[in-house]
Regions:
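Catalytic cores of soluble, metal-dependent hydrolases
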Residues: 32, 46-51, 55, 60-184
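Active-site histidine-anchored catalytic micro-motif
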Residues: 1-41, 45, 132-136, 149
Length: 184
């Protein structure tokens, strides 16, 4: 399965004439028999065609709006993460599009959209996945685009990549560091 953190569904059959584009990557992934499920988290921008594809029993969508509204009603991020992780089968690839985060974390990405994850929410979900007993078999981090006059996007992307490497190591029982606890 793919755990897909993104602002966009990326389920278009084609985008601007391109069958294999950033807007159709998850549609193309669904064409592979090895991909049994895509669990999308943080989605907040999509078209009608993508909604039709997402209604497949192989796609589970947790929109940013629904997650935020549940939080307003008292559902904790931990509870939401548990539900997201429960929707995944045993073997998981993480696909993280940086525009899944709040736009101020990656203002130079190609298609920023209001809303999204905080850095802490994203890293918490990934850490919970590492501890879940599911097997993380790979990951990617995409659409990180440092700006012309600053490296903020690159800084955030590098920190997320560092965390994702730690999540993969932890999931594979490699002891690469311990969490520092300042308060008991």
């Amino acid at each position: 399965a793919i755990l897909h953190l993104d602002a966009h569904m990326d389920l278009r059959i084609a985008y601007e004439g391109f069958t294999y584009s950033h807007a159709s990557i998850m549609y193309n992934a669904l064409q592979l028999p090895q991909i049994t499920k895509i669990v999308q988290v943080g989605i907040r921008d999509f078209c009608e065609q993508e909604v039709e594809v997402a209604q497949s029993d192989r796609v589970v969508v947790f929109t940013d709006r629904d997650l935020k509204h549940e939080a307003f009603e008292g559902i904790t991020w931990k509870q939401q993460c548990d539900t997201i992780i429960a929707a995944l089968p045993q073997k998981v690839v993480i696909s993280f599009d940086i525009d899944g985060m709040y736009p101020w974390y990656a203002p130079n990405t190609g298609t920023p959209v209001p809303g999204g994850f905080s850095f802490e929410e994203a890293t918490y979900l990934l850490s919970k996945l590492a501890d879940s007993g599911k097997e993380i078999i790979g990951f990617d981090l995409v659409e990180v685009a440092p700006g012309e006059n600053d490296d903020w996007d690159g800084n955030v992307g590098a920190r997320m990549l560092f965390h994702m490497c730690g999540v993969l190591a932890k999931n594979n029982k490699l002891h690469v560091g311990e969490t520092i606890v300042f308060h008991k």
